């Protein structure tokens, strides 16, 4: 068996492990509608997924009065909480995580979600025990700042050079680059394949099964 390139695999959550992209887009649009603000189109709303909630609201609606951003965040939370218990993991995620853990990898999540939201989602999906550590945007800097990866590697005593970030957005890949970690993209989430390819990930998976196979063969 070939020597592993990585010891530590860090996953984004929304759009990478959980099938939540479309729901997040609809909740951003519903929040804007509630406040009678211009409703962002689906592409604009999807682009900000992965950022902290505050940064996402500013990025998706840069031309509105800043006083609306906290209200947008509140309305977004309202709509998301109505739906989040229905959100599934992508097919194959549970099996992939189980297999990777059995192979001896350290596993973590780095997400733009808040701590309460991530814990609720992970408990609902019954995967909390599969991860060695997690980091949320309300605990440190938002992506693409490298802090999440820096803190996770420090917490688990891992080497950044042997750390792999897996995500569906350019925010994930930029965070990895900023931290000095390698990255793999997934094309089934929020950002399109062309945008992801521009950041030269080691691999770009079209689905979880391709991702699982690549990690098994190459990571």
Predicted stretch roles:
Residues 49-81, 91-94, 99-101:
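A metal-dependent, Asp-based hydrolase signature
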Residues 27, 41-44, 52, 56, ...:
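Hydrophobic alpha-helical segments typical of transmembrane helices
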Residues 26-30, 55, 59, 75, ...:
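Alpha-helical elements of Rossmann-like donor-binding domains used by nucleotide-donor carbohydrate transfer enzymes
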Residues 2-47:
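Active-site neighborhood of HAD-like aspartate-dependent phosphohydrolases
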Residues 82-109, 115-119, 146:
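Short, acidic loop-to-helix structural element flanking the phosphoryl-transfer center
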Residues 33-38, 64-67, 102-103, 126-130, ...:
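Short helix-capping segments at alpha-helix termini
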Residues 2-9, 101, 114-115, 119-219:
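Asp-based, Mg2+/Mn2+-dependent phosphohydrolase catalytic module
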């Amino acid at each position: 068996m070939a020597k592993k390139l990585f010891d530590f695999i860090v996953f984004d959550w929304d759009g990478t492990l959980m099938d939540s992209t479309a729901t997040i887009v609809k909740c951003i649009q519903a929040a804007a509608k509630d406040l009678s603000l211009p409703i962002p189109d689906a592409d604009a709303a999807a682009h900000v997924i992965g950022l902290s909630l505050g940064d996402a609201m500013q990025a998706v609606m840069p031309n509105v009065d800043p006083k609306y951003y906290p209200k947008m965040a509140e309305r977004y939370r309202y709509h998301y909480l109505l739906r989040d218990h229905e959100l599934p993991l992508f097919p194959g995620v549970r099996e992939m995580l189980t297999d990777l853990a059995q192979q001896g990898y350290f596993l973590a999540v780095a997400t733009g979600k808040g701590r309460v939201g991530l814990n609720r989602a992970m408990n609902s999906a019954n995967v909390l025990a599969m991860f060695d550590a997690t980091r949320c945007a309300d605990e440190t800097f938002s992506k693409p700042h490298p802090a999440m990866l820096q803190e996770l590697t420090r917490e688990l005593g891992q080497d950044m050079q042997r750390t792999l970030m897996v995500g569906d957005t350019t925010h994930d890949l930029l965070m990895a680059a900023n931290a000095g970690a390698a990255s793999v993209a997934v094309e089934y989430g929020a950002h399109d394949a062309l945008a992801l390819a521009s950041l030269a990930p080691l691999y770009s998976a079209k689905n979880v099964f391709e991702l699982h196979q690549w990690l098994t063969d190459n990571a």
